[in-house]
Amino acid sequence: MGSGQWHMEKRSTLKNDSFVKEYNPVTETGSLSIIVLGASGDLAKKKTFPALFNLFHQGFLNPDEVHIFGYARSKITDEELRDKIRGYLVDEKNASKKTEALSKFLKLIKYVSGPYDSEEGFKRLDKAILEHEISKKTAEGSSRRLFYLALPPSVYPPVSKMIKAWCTNKSDLGGWTRIVVEKPFGKDLESAEQLSSQIGALFEEPQIYRIDHYLGKELVQNMLVLRFANRLFLPLWNRDNIANVQIVFREDFGTEGRGGYFDEYGIIRDIIQNHLLQVLCLVAMEKPISLKPEHIRDEKVKVLQSVIPIKDEEVVLGQYEGYRDDPTVPNDSNTPTFATTILRINNERWEGVPFILKAGKAMSSKKADIRIQFKDVPGDIFKCQNQGRNEFVIRLQPSEAMYMKLTVKQPGLEMQTVQSELDLSYKQRYQDVSIPEAYERLILDTIRGDQQHFVRRDELKAAWEIFTPLLHRIDKGEVKSVPYKQGSRGPAEADQLLKKAGYMQTHGYIWIPPTL
């Protein structure tokens, strides 16, 4: 262990049973039909089906109740779909342990082919679902239908119409119909509101689950617990003690294979306006009156509505060199592959504290983290401020971890200071615990009817209100992207903006993950 780490013994994890009883939704019985629309696409193969398999393998999907349907335009058989997804469900290391479960899971999958705007296709889908419900003796319980739209947003309206017209729950004994829609939810405020109105005319808000997989990440979900269950942070979490907040997303690869798609959206629409802004809400929100989903989402909306308009001088856009070499990208593209923007929240807790949102592709590393940087110690008698400030870092990926950067005495005979850390690395503390993937958690929440980690319509609207004016200026070429080298930290102008915002970088400090 490093000199500044906590000593963490392996011990049983204590659970608060009263919390579990109060906030876990009641388990329902009856048939459960999970319909994956866009079943032959990359999202379904790489994320949706693997998440469903892991839930099945862990016992969260009862084979006596559940059946999974794939729907897409591809004319393939049940077995061909199973073959397409088989390789994504288990890795070589765990294949032998999961052979039996994999076989049982694949047998639950049935495929229906048809267009996304065709009555006949959805009538066939409904017939297949009804046959499943009858075989599962739905008369003994409710009929539940979950539609996962692993599709481009352009087909959400026609698909939603077909589901509403032909495929909703028909049981007299209760149950539900729910739809899950993926980002992007529009390209700006107007298109997002239009999409919301089209879907909202067909389904009630409690039926609509707008998924942002960042809200399913373990340490993102930990944010409310960290803030409101630990007395340590309560008096510190404000403008009197915090100098700035940085929320960072980096990828070490470019847009290979999807340059044309990415060029329509850019890094702000792809990452910052949704993923990073959702994290900001959890960092900045006030304590909700309870853990009910609506109370939490009410507080998130208040944060978004308190963000003042973004200033162009507090934005740096970048585009990595070689991006336009992709034949699907226009030669004169101004689409940013990197952006740093400062958001400011006009309320009593956060006035004057810059929230720095930063995301980029083709950078020097792949990671995502939250950095809460505290102010300097007043009257510093050790003269050590140039070594760096206290900083609470939450590493979202890879290798989930939390650590607090502290100044301590360096071991030895002299009174010298050095930066170290108090460290909680999840892989060390929870060696025997399987940390679920974000999609597993969110799909399970959907089945349970828990909307806490999904985006509400007014929340979506408020998020687009923040970024739409800036995005329109970028689209018109009024804010330019500057070039940066692949494998770098991004444009130098971004570091200058951070310095101007008051972020103090700790030069020479490197966090070393503990050895297991």
Swiss-Prot record:
Its EC number is 1.1.1.49. The keyword Cytoplasm applies. NADP(+) 2 binds at residues 358, 367, 371, 395, 403-405, 423-425, 489, 511. Keywords: Carbohydrate metabolism, Cytoplasm, Glucose metabolism, NADP, Oxidoreductase. The active site is at residue 275. Optimum pH is 8.5. GO terms for biological process: glucose metabolic process; pentose-phosphate shunt, oxidative branch. There are 6 glucose-6-phosphate 1-dehydrogenase genes in A.thaliana. NCBIfam families: zwf. This is Glucose-6-phosphate 1-dehydrogenase 5, cytoplasmic. It comes from Arabidopsis thaliana (Mouse-ear cress).
